[in-house]
Amino acid sequence: MSESVHTNPSLYSKGMLAVICAQFLSAFGDNALLFATLALMKQLYYPEWSQPVLQMLFVGAYILFAPFVGQFADSFAKGRVMMVANGLKLLGAGCICFGVNPFIGYTLVGIGAAAYSPAKYGILGELTTGDKLVKANGLMESSTIAAILLGSMAGGILADWHVLAALIVCALVYGGAVVANLWIPRLPAARPGQSWRFKPMTHSFFSACRTLWRNGETRFSLMGTSLFWGAGVTLRFLLVIWVPVALGITSNAMPTYLNAMVAVGIVLGAGAAAKLVTLETVSRCMPAGILIGIAVIAFAVQQSLLPAFGLLLLLGVFGGFFIVPLNALLQERGKHSVGAGNAIAVQNLGENVAMLLMLGLYSLAVSVGVPPVAVGIGFGAVFAVAIAALWVWGRRK
């Protein structure tokens, strides 16, 4: 294994390809494991209300460990941090395979995912820089979306065949991610020697929050990415109740196909952003953010399948074009102020809090009887207005 302390000028260096491969396997395992675990819970007659609790534990791990995972990523070689995090995921999947309570096993996977995220994004800024960082983010997002698509389908298909076999495959995939991490060059720690006592660590994290919030560019990025991912999770749940009402289709598979169209669009949009947007022209992505909300409104009133597929594909393109430059901006600016690991940890906190808040508002709307079509229209309108307000505010600052 080679060791390097310099940024490699090539976008397709061995280290970068190892990062992308490890990310694909890790994200594939996350999504396959979710569906395999849900199938296990169904087989064991867990109540239906327990299924979203599984996802809440996963998201909750990000929020609970946010003050610590950024420093963890910046205190050691990020490739090794990624390996340890994938090892935790492997342990969690193994626990579920051996009959440990699935909530415990999946919580371990969530902790691993929380530790993994700052390192996987932070290392991009150490392996490449400048405009190539935007392209590297495009590769990362594209591999992630591909893993979400394939992992979700694989988890469901394998679980229909044999639940335990599906869980074992998930564990093996995490094992493959650990092996892929071995090929990532051992870069020097970004910020070694920091205190590991609880109070200094939390103080350091919230100090990083203040630093990033006071900077106009990083505040702009944090708010944009939080809105995007909060909306993305909400849309996934909205599709489940919208399909039977708007299209008259009761198949469980149809919402999955529609989600797949969004994912394909994100890959296309991420590729376009890598070619058309630089760190100096990040504001070009903002119209795409507004168009996401408009596309949701147009989608919500559809009653035919083909236009619905087309609009969700377009929505995904806008989403990919919107999110990739904002991620790159935060990594580049955060690397020089609080460290890339801390910057991504702060970003994760914002995004996961946004997910919980938006899902809470969505659940409230559904619980009081708001029709799914009206929920979609209101959701799209609020998102478009929020992004427009963020754009105007950012230009004034």
UniProtKB/Swiss-Prot annotation:
It is found in: Cell inner membrane. The chain crosses the membrane at residues 16-36, 53-73, 91-111, 139-159, 164-184, 227-247, 253-273, 281-301, 305-325, 352-372, 373-393. One of its GO terms (molecular function) is lysophospholipid:sodium symporter activity. InterPro entries: LysoPLipid__transptr_LplT (IPR023727), MFS (IPR011701), MFS_trans_sf (IPR036259). Keywords: Cell inner membrane, Cell membrane, Lipid transport, Membrane, Transmembrane, Transmembrane helix, Transport. GO terms for cellular component: plasma membrane. The keyword rRNA processing does not apply. It is a multi-pass membrane protein. This is Lysophospholipid transporter LplT. It comes from Klebsiella pneumoniae subsp. pneumoniae (strain ATCC 700721 / MGH 78578).
